[in-house]
Design a protein with these regions (language model features):
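Active-site C-terminal subdomain of aminotransferase-like
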Residues: 2-105, 109-112
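A structural signal for short secondary-structure junctions
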Residues: 6-7, 93, 110-115, 135, ...
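Short, well-ordered alpha-helical packing segments
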Residues: 10-13, 99, 120, 131, ...
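Hydrophobic, well-ordered secondary-structure elements that form the walls
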Residues: 12, 91, 119, 134, ...
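Cofactor-binding beta-sheet edge motifs in enzyme active sites
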Residues: 72, 76-84, 112, 116-119, ...
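Membrane-embedded transmembrane-helix bundle of lipid-linked glycan/lipid transferases
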Residues: 86, 90, 98, 102-103, ...
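Conserved PLP-binding catalytic core of the aspartate aminotransferase-like
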Residues: 106-137
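PLP-dependent enzyme catalytic core of the Aspartate aminotransferase-like
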Residues: 125, 129, 133-136, 146-176
Length: 176
């Protein structure tokens, strides 16, 4: 629901047990019913925030990011449970597709464990050179990590054609 914004503000979605919910830092938006019986969204569990009980606050949020919370709430409401599930399935499916395309292009996955939409590969070429080539071709490539590794990520917005082209560029740089 929120586009990237040069490092922030941003937010994420999470699930937790009742026992743990008051231990979570940050602002949490919850669904409720207003006095007219209409569905609405509010900043919930506010007792732990700095502006209510500063001495027990578990977060350092000092500025209001309510617009982000509102945007995310509208997005989640519009998506519904099935829509959000579909987005998650697309992210996972596309990440696994890209990992296999990159494996075929010469990169080796570092971990053989279940993953959602991010994964790490070893890169036989200079990661800075690969990143420069990808940027030159209009890709915000993987994140170079220490030791010649790269963190890759997909979302529901990535197309098969984009991932195929990315793998071709990787093969061009890494296996030339």
């Amino acid at each position: 629901g929120l586009p990237m914004a040069f490092g922030g503000p941003y937010l994420g979605f999470m699930a937790t047990t009742r026992d743990m919910m008051r231990k979570l830092p940050g602002r949490i938006v919850g669904e409720t019913v207003d006095s007219d019986g209409k569905r609405g969204f509010v900043l919930t569990l506010q007792a732990r925030e700095q502006h209510i009980r500063r001495e027990k606050a578990s977060s350092n949020i000092c500025s209001n990011r309510a617009l982000c919370a509102l945007t995310a709430s509208v997005y989640l409401s519009a998506m519904g449970p099935e829509g959000l599930r579909e987005v998650a399935l697309q992210c996972t499916s596309k990440a696994h597709y890209l990992r296999e395309k990159l494996r075929a292009a010469g990169l080796s996955p570092v971990y053989d464990k279940p993953f959602f939409h991010e994964f790490v590969t070893d890169c036989p070429a200079d990661t800075a050179r690969l990143s420069a080539k990808l940027e030159e071709e209009g890709y915000l490539g993987g994140l170079p990590l220490p030791g010649g590794r790269i963190l890759w990520c997909t979302t529901e917005m990535n197309t098969k054609e984009e991932m195929d082209r990315l793998a071709d560029l990787v093969k061009e740089v890494c296996c030339a």
